[in-house]
Swiss-Prot record:
Recorded family membership: Belongs to the eukaryotic ribosomal protein eS8 family.
Protein keywords: Ribonucleoprotein, Ribosomal protein
Known partners and oligomeric status: Part of the 30S ribosomal subunit.
Signal sequence, start to end: none
GO (cellular component) term, any one: ribosome
HAMAP family given in the database record: Ribosomal_eS8 (MF_00029)
Pfam families cross-referenced by the UniProt entry: Ribosomal_S8e
GO terms under biological process: translation
Chain spans, region Disordered: 1-34
One GO MF term: structural constituent of ribosome
Gene assigned in the entry: rps8e
UniProt protein name: Small ribosomal subunit protein eS8
Source organism: Methanopyrus kandleri (strain AV19 / DSM 6324 / JCM 9639 / NBRC 100938)
Disulphide bridges, residue numbers: none
Length: 133
């Protein structure tokens, strides 16, 4: 079933609002793209306003991790999702969102972008003590 972002057909009191027109395509929405750690990188494409194509990341294998001390950015393999403050469900199922802490080849990193809306995972390297505290 589709997601609809139009106005509710009920008033706050529970009374009915009679629609003056049908639902329009531009009022349609999409379920969120929940990015997972996978064996192969996979994108999810969806239609945007004006026929544009929005790309989200469905499965991620690598992340661009920036080291704040040296200023270097490395493309490293993602091993697992350690913590996700967005939701316990996301943490349990290993969903990558902005703010999630992931374990990479070079250490723990905090995700700084929204991979469900951008086809890449960007992160900043953090110290082991910061994550535990």
């Amino acid at each position: 079933m589709g997601v609809w972002h139009g106005r509710s057909l009920r008033k706050p009191t529970g009374g009915r609002i009679r629609p003056h027109r049908k639902k329009r395509k531009f009022e349609m929405g999409n379920p969120p793209t929940e990015t997972l750690v996978g064996e192969e990188r996979k994108l999810k494409e969806r239609r945007g306003m004006g026929g544009n194509v929005k790309k989200g990341l469905k499965f991620a294998t690598h992340a661009n991790v920036a080291d704040p001390e040296t200023g270097e950015v490395k493309c490293v393999r993602i091993e697992e999702v350690v913590k996700n403050p967005a939701s316990q469900y996301y943490e349990r199922h290993g969903v990558i969102t902005k703010g999630a802490i992931i374990r990479t080849e070079i250490g723990l990193a905090k995700v700084t972008n929204r991979p469900g809306q951008e086809p890449v995972v960007n992160a900043v390297l953090i110290k082991e003590e910061e994550e535990e505290g």
